[in-house]
Amino acid sequence: MFCVQCEQTIRTPAGNGCSYAQGMCGKTAETSDLQDLLIAALQGLSAWAVKAREYGIINHDVDNFAPRAFFSTLTNVNFDSPRIVGYAREAIALREALKAQCLSVDANAHCDNPMADLQLVSDDLGELQRQAAEFTPNKDKAAIGENILGLRLLCLYGLKGAAAYMEHAHVLGQYDNDIYAQYHKIMAWLGTWPADMNALLECAMEIGQMNFKVMSILDAGETTKYGHPTPTQVNVKATEGKCILISGHDLKDLYNLLEQTEGTGVNVYTHGEMLPAHGYPELRKFKHLVGNYGSGWQNQQVEFARFPGPIVMTSNCIIDPTVGSYDDRIWTRSIVGWPGVSHLEGDDFGPVIAQAQQMAGFPYSEIPHLITVGFGRQTLLGAADTLIDLVSRKKLRHIFLVGGCDGARGERNYFTDFATSVPDDCLILTLACGKYRFNKLEFGDIEGLPRLVDAGQCNDAYSAIILAVTLAEKLGCGVNDLPLSLVLSWFEQKAIVILLTLLSLGVKNIVTGPTAPGFFTPDLLAILNEKFGLRSVTTVEEDMKQLLSA
C-alpha cells in the first residue's frame, strides 16, 4: 500500500504516505492496492479512447464509465474491494469492445501504451493485490526522485478531482466531447509514467483549465434542472417527525428522494455538501425538505449515530459506520461503497423510505436556528455593482474567500479564528464544507449586504471565479489587483483540482492549509511559490495583516 492523496496521510521523517495495513481514512491496504490496479485499467481504457477518436469513434459508454470509475478511488468514497475489482473488469471489457471497434476500421490498429493490454491475473483478491504491486504510484521513486513523483501525483490527483466533477455533471445530462477527449488524453499519458518536470507542470495547468470547463457544464446542469440559487434561510435544528438524511453532492439523488418521499410523512434533511441544495428553487419547493443536520463530514460518526432515521451517501465523504453502530441504516449510492452496508443500485429509494417509516424520527421540534445559503452565480453577479459601490465609498475594504474542505486536524481551527477575525468592513465569501467551521456564527451586514456569503458547494468556486472576473472587468483591472484574498483549506482531490483551476487562470497569492499536501516536496512548494505566490498559512494575525496590506 502507498497512498498520499489526502490531508490526513501519515507523515514521518522517513517520508509521507499511508503504507501499512490500513490508511488513516480507514481504507485497507487491499482496497488501496486494488484501486491502483483499477487506475491502471482505466489508463489503458483511456489510451484506446484516444486511439478510437483518431478513427472518429466516440464510445459514449466508455466516456460515461471512465470518470465515474476513477471517482470511486477518491478519498472516502468506496472502501469495498469487490466493487473496485468489478470496475476494473468493466474497464477492461469496455476497452476490448473499443479495441474491436478500432480494428473494424483498421486491421492494424495498435495502441502504444503500457496499460493498453492489461489483463487481471485472477479472480482471487489476494492474487489481484499482488498484481497491483506493479502499479503502485511510488514504484520507481528511487529512479525518478521525489519531485517527479510529487508532480505525477499532483496531476493524477488533480485529474481525479476533475473526474468527480465530470460525473456530477454527467448525471445531470451534461456532456462535452472536447472535455472527454482531453480527459482521456491526460489519463492515458499518465499511464506512461512520465518523468519530464516541465511536461508534468504543463499537464497540471492543463488539468486546471479543463476543470474550469467541467465546472461550467456542471453549473449549467444544476441551474438548468433546478433553477438558479437565491438566498434562502435554512433551519439547522430538528423538526418533529420521521426523517431521512442525505449527504454528498448529487442534487439529482436529492430531487428523486424528495419526489418519492412527498406525501409519506417523512422529512428530509441535508448534510455536508448538500446544504447549498436549499437555495435551488426546484428543490426547496418541497416543503418536507425541512433543514440541514450536523456539521463537517469528519463528525459523522457521532452525528449519524444520533440521527433517528436512515442516511443516504451519494458521494464523498463516508467513514466507518460501524464505529457509531449505524451501519444497518446507512445506504450508499452510485460509486460510494462500504463493506456490508446496503447499496442502492438505481434511483428507487423505496427501501430507505420504508426504513424511515419504521423508525421513531425526532420526537419534538427544536427552537429553529436559521442560516442563509443560496448566493449562486446569478445572485453574486447581481450584487457586483453594489460591491463596487461599497468599495468606492470605502464601506467595503476587502473580500476574503475562506472555504474549501474540512477535516479533523486541530490546526483547522485556524479557519474559524480567521473568519471571526475578519474586520467589520470586510466580507467573507465561503464555499464547500470548510464553511462548517463558522457558518452558524453571526457576522452581521454592511449596509444590508450580509458579511458572510455562502456561494455553495466546492464546485461553485466557478461562481466565485466568474464574480472575480466580472468585478475586475468593471473596475478595469486584473483579478489579482482586486481587494480579494483567497484563504483555502484542502483535504482531498477535489480541492487539489480547484487549486489547479485557480492557478491555471493566473490567480496568485493564494494562502492554503492547514498543511501542504504530503506529495508536495520543498522544491515543488518553492516552484509554486515563485510562479504563483502560493504559500501556506502561518498565524491568523500575520496572515490577516499581510493580506490586508497587499
UniProtKB/Swiss-Prot annotation:
Matches recorded under InterPro entries: HCP/CODH, Hydroxylam_reduct, Prismane-like_a/b-sand, Prismane-like_sf, Prismane_a-bundle
Q: Which residues bind [2Fe-2S] cluster?
A: 3, 6, 18, 25
- Which cofactors is this protein said to need? [2Fe-2S] cluster; hybrid [4Fe-2O-2S] cluster
Q: Which UniProt keywords apply?
A: 2Fe-2S, Cytoplasm, Iron, Iron-sulfur, Metal-binding, Oxidoreductase
Q: Where in the cell is it found?
A: Cytoplasm
Q: Which GO terms describe its molecular function?
A: 2 iron, 2 sulfur cluster binding; hydroxylamine reductase activity; metal ion binding; peroxidase activity
Q: Which GO terms describe its biological process?
A: response to hydrogen peroxide
Checking CDD domains in the record gives: HCP
The principal location of this protein is cytoplasm
Give the similarity note. Belongs to the HCP family.
Alphabetized PANTHER family for the sequence: HYDROXYLAMINE REDUCTASE
User: What HAMAP family does the entry give?
Assistant: Hydroxylam_reduct
Give the protein's biological function: Catalyzes the reduction of hydroxylamine to form NH(3) and H(2)O.
Put simply, this protein is called Hydroxylamine reductase
Source organism of this protein record: Salmonella schwarzengrund (strain CVM19633)
